[in-house]
Amino acid sequence: MSRLNVELPGLDLKNPVMPASGCFAFGAEFSQFYDLSELGAIMIKAATKEARYGNETPRVAETDSGMINAIGLQNPGVHHIIEHELKKLEQFDVPIIANVAGSVEEDYVYVAEHISKAPNVKALELNISCPNVKEGGMQFGVDPQVAAELTRKVKAVSEVPVYVKLSPNVTNIVEMAKAIAEYADGLTMINTLVGLRIDGKSGKPIIANTIGGLSGPAIKPVALRMVYEVRKAIDIPIIAMGGVQNAQDVIDYISVGANAVAVGTANFQNPMVCKEIIDELPTLLDKLGVDHINELYGRTHEVMK
């Protein structure tokens, strides 16, 4: 039996490593670098009811230990994604987690109902926490009751388990998680932190949207803390993300209570990073003296007792 396999609602993962939505396009582009069947899963780019052209450029700015982006959920629309992008991925033996976004509740429900019927989509990721769009997006992710109600409506039409992506831009993430957990099958966390970078010469924001989402190694301590707090409060499957660059980062997240881990910004720096992390994990398990990665699950909570 594999030392890395993980079972979650709707997801039978060969290993706990997957690319995060928005950092891997629709996946097929990366197949030139390695066999995508080696991944635990693929979180594809967000799908909306209609095609979105995204925000004005520039949309990306490098920061110390990370980057700020304001792409604006650019995508060709849910039906194009189902008919073209998802079909390209059918050749790979890997479960797909489809990211669902929208401007109003009805958009989320529409996208979820349609994309959850695709044969290789095994779970949905409900994107209620994107800080880069002027309507929808994060507005659903900062009010516990609104988030819970949206989750309930999406869950009612989805043919696969529903995971909800939590925003770190809230006062109390545990309160959000508890409200959503009433209807969700799992959580993904965290989305980007709202950030700003300005040009030192002119004082103008570098990104046309003014603000954007901060990601990369800079946010890992925040994400670790939030995963730790949510896991301490409730028992629900968690796919963690935020600054993952190597196998030790994966171990850190599993230690605080994540079941699996998604790699985001690092894919832009190194398209091989997910495969390298997967290959590195058994060696790290040997060094830690454990047979299966699940033995490390939640160990931080155990040593704190």
Curated annotation (Swiss-Prot):
Cell compartment(s), UniProt: Cytoplasm
Keyword Iron: no
List of residues binding FMN: S21, K45, A46, N99, N127, K165, I190, G216, G242, G243, G264, T265
Main localization category: cytoplasm
Gene3D superfamilies: Aldolase class I
GO molecular function list: dihydroorotate dehydrogenase (NAD+) activity
Keywords: Cytoplasm, Flavoprotein, FMN, NAD, Oxidoreductase, Pyrimidine biosynthesis
InterPro entries, sorted: Aldolase_TIM (IPR013785), DHO_dehydrogenase (IPR050074), DHOD_1B (IPR033888), Dihydroorotate_DH_1 (IPR024920), Dihydroorotate_DH_1_2 (IPR012135), Dihydroorotate_DH_cat (IPR005720), Dihydroorotate_DH_CS (IPR001295), Dihydroorotate_DH_I (IPR049622)
KW Signal (keyword) present: no
CDD domains: DHOD_1B_like
Reactions this protein catalyses: (S)-dihydroorotate + NAD(+) = orotate + NADH + H(+)
Sequence positions that bind substrate: K45, N69, A70, I71, G72, L73, N127, N191, T192
Pathway: Pyrimidine metabolism; UMP biosynthesis via de novo pathway; orotate from (S)-dihydroorotate (NAD(+) route): step 1/1
GO biological process assignments: 'de novo' pyrimidine nucleobase biosynthetic process; 'de novo' UMP biosynthetic process
EC number: 1.3.1.14
GO cellular component: cytoplasm
Subunit structure, interactors included: Heterotetramer of 2 PyrK and 2 PyrD type B subunits.
Protein name (Swiss-Prot/TrEMBL): Dihydroorotate dehydrogenase B (NAD(+)), catalytic subunit
